[in-house]
């Protein structure tokens, strides 16, 4: 899937987890909005999530993911299990299968990418990015990770600023959430 119009990044470092995104919404070649919020806190602020793709589809997926997390009878928050369960449903369900979005979800211990093709990816490094500017932000973040003085929030902000300079579908109106 190749979504135009956003860049979302997730980073873990020094006990902090950050998900950040730009604010641009495009329709074709037109910028419709520059200050959209594409990330949110779920499960009473214990999980961060961000999306690239259709907004209405992403909201549906956020709700489904949160349902999966909360469905455990033992009350344990297990985003890996919830992500796999959501990916299975997303791939198999006739209605969900048509949703066009990708998600990043993160808690204090994990960062995951969930796609509609059934993929659940845990990055090798403590950083992952999606969307049209995702590769630019990811590359910049990997370079910034070498500077041990930078926090997860600093790295996310700087990486998105670089993506905004290169990707025409990404702007520098950055929204950032942090847990940990």
From Swiss-Prot:
According to the UniProt entry, its GO molecular function terms are:
metal ion binding; threonine-type endopeptidase activity
Biological process per Gene Ontology, one example term: proteolysis involved in protein catabolic process
Q: Which GO terms describe its cellular component?
A: HslUV protease complex; proteasome core complex
Gene3D superfamilies membership: Glutamine Phosphoribosylpyrophosphate, subunit 1, domain 1
Q: What does this protein do?
A: Protease subunit of a proteasome-like degradation complex believed to be a general protein degrading machinery.
What are the catalytic residues?
6
Origin organism is Borrelia recurrentis (strain A1)
Q: Which family does it belong to?
A: Belongs to the peptidase T1B family. HslV subfamily.
Partners and quaternary state?
A: A double ring-shaped homohexamer of HslV is capped on each side by a ring-shaped HslU homohexamer. The assembly of the HslU/HslV complex is dependent on binding of ATP.
Pfam family example for this protein? Proteasome
Q: How is its activity regulated?
A: Allosterically activated by HslU binding.
Q: Which cysteines are joined by disulfide bonds?
A: none
EC number(s) of the enzyme?
3.4.25.2
Which keywords does this chain's UniProt record carry? Answer: Allosteric enzyme, Cytoplasm, Hydrolase, Metal-binding, Protease, Sodium, Stress response, Threonine protease
Question: PROSITE patterns attached here?
Answer: PROTEASOME_BETA_2
Any idea which positions bind Na(+)?
A: 164, 167, 170
Q: What is this protein called?
A: ATP-dependent protease subunit HslV
Starting at the broadest rank, the lineage of the source organism is: Bacteria, Pseudomonadati, Spirochaetota, Spirochaetia, Spirochaetales
Q: Which reaction does it catalyse?
A: ATP-dependent cleavage of peptide bonds with broad specificity
């Amino acid at each position: 899937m190749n979504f135009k119009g956003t860049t979302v990044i997730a980073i873990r470092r020094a006990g902090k987890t950050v998900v950040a995104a730009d604010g641009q919404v495009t329709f074709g070649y037109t910028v419709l909005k520059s200050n959209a919020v594409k990330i949110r806190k779920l499960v009473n602020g214990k999980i961060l999530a961000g999306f690239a793709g259709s907004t209405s589809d992403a909201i549906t997926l956020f709700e489904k993911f949160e349902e999966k997390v909360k469905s455990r009878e033992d009350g344990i928050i297990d985003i890996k299990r919830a992500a796999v369960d959501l990916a299975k449903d997303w791939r198999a369900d006739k209605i969900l299968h048509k949703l066009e979005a990708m998600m990043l979800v993160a808690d204090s211990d994990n960062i995951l990418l969930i796609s509609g093709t059934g993929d659940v990816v845990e990055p090798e490094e403590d950083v992952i990015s999606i969307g049209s500017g995702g590769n630019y932000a990811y590359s910049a973040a990997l370079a910034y990770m070498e500077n041990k003085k930078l926090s997860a929030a600093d790295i996310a902000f700087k990486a998105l600023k670089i993506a905004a300079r290169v990707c025409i579908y990404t702007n520098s109106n950055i929204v950032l959430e942090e847990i940990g």
